Amino acid sequence: MPELPEVETIRRTLAPVLIGALVIGALRGEHPEDILLDPWPVFARRVRRHRIVALERRGKYLAARFEDGDRLVIHLGMTGELRLSHPATAPGKHCHLALVLRSLRPLPPSLVDQRQRFLLRYLDIRRFGRIALLDQAGWETFTARLGPEPLDPTLDPRALWSRLRERRTAIKAALLDQALLAGIGNIYADEALFQARLHPARRCQTLSLDEVERLLVALRTVLSAAIENAGTTIRDYRDGQGRAGSFQSRLQVYGKPAGTPCPRCGTGLARIRIAGRSSVFCPRCQPLH
């Protein structure tokens, strides 16, 4: 599933093309009803005649903001992909819908036709992604349910520690809760816990302030490095230009088979399940007690 670094990379690579473009229509694909919160006819009518003035991200959500304050909010699920395409290109498999846009500035002929039209296609093999049109009030209500982001410089470690002390869950499960911190998934939770030397099954209320400060530093370091490397491509993820990320070559523990030597101490890595997700860690570097 694309996490904060992947969605931020998509935002950065799509923004130069999308900002300023006018949505002039929508094309129905294979199964738009599995992706859209609105029925197709309602969505196709509502999305037309909107100009994109900003491309925003909140946690794992991408939002195209229109000039009237409405937003097209996209969650990519497990295998969602946004792909810029020339109108004459075939959609291919697993394309569920496309926006038809007109650019007000010149774009490469490989992307636009003679009328400066191009497509933004949504592809999704597993169809777990979601797309919704929200007005300003709906967007504010929706984002109010999300926690702060680890990269927010105003996030206070003491405030995070206070919130964690109220929880009796494992720290790994807490990190996956978007109401606590927005944008973290399985990849970067495992990587940050390894860097912070914290066992994924440690109970939140047992963490000291120093440990929470260390965890927040690790989260910021890992997420920033992942963004610098255009995200992590395990299988499906591509950025807004169709390119794979490269952070997968820098992963320390995520996805490693049990018994793989720890990159820090050489101890065999262990794998357990927490909150229904696989967690990989070093039993020596990340002791439970």
From Swiss-Prot:
Positions that bind DNA: 94, 126, 167
Catalyzed chemical reaction(s): Hydrolysis of DNA containing ring-opened 7-methylguanine residues, releasing 2,6-diamino-4-hydroxy-5-(N-methyl)formamidopyrimidine; 2'-deoxyribonucleotide-(2'-deoxyribose 5'-phosphate)-2'-deoxyribonucleotide-DNA = a 3'-end 2'-deoxyribonucleotide-(2,3-dehydro-2,3-deoxyribose 5'-phosphate)-DNA + a 5'-end 5'-phospho-2'-deoxyribonucleoside-DNA + H(+)
GO molecular function annotation: 8-oxo-7,8-dihydroguanine DNA N-glycosylase activity; class I DNA-(apurinic or apyrimidinic site) endonuclease activity; damaged DNA binding; zinc ion binding
Key words, A-Z: DNA damage, DNA repair, DNA-binding, Glycosidase, Hydrolase, Lyase, Metal-binding, Multifunctional enzyme, Zinc, Zinc-finger
Family recorded in the similarity comment: Belongs to the FPG family.
HAMAP family: Fapy_DNA_glycosyl (MF_00103)
Function, as annotated: Involved in base excision repair of DNA damaged by oxidation or by mutagenic agents. Acts as a DNA glycosylase that recognizes and removes damaged bases. Has a preference for oxidized purines, such as 7,8-dihydro-8-oxoguanine (8-oxoG). Has AP (apurinic/apyrimidinic) lyase activity and introduces nicks in the DNA strand. Cleaves the DNA backbone by beta-delta elimination to generate a single-strand break at the site of the removed base with both 3'- and 5'-phosphates.
Protein name: Formamidopyrimidine-DNA glycosylase
Biological source species: Thermomicrobium roseum (strain ATCC 27502 / DSM 5159 / P-2)
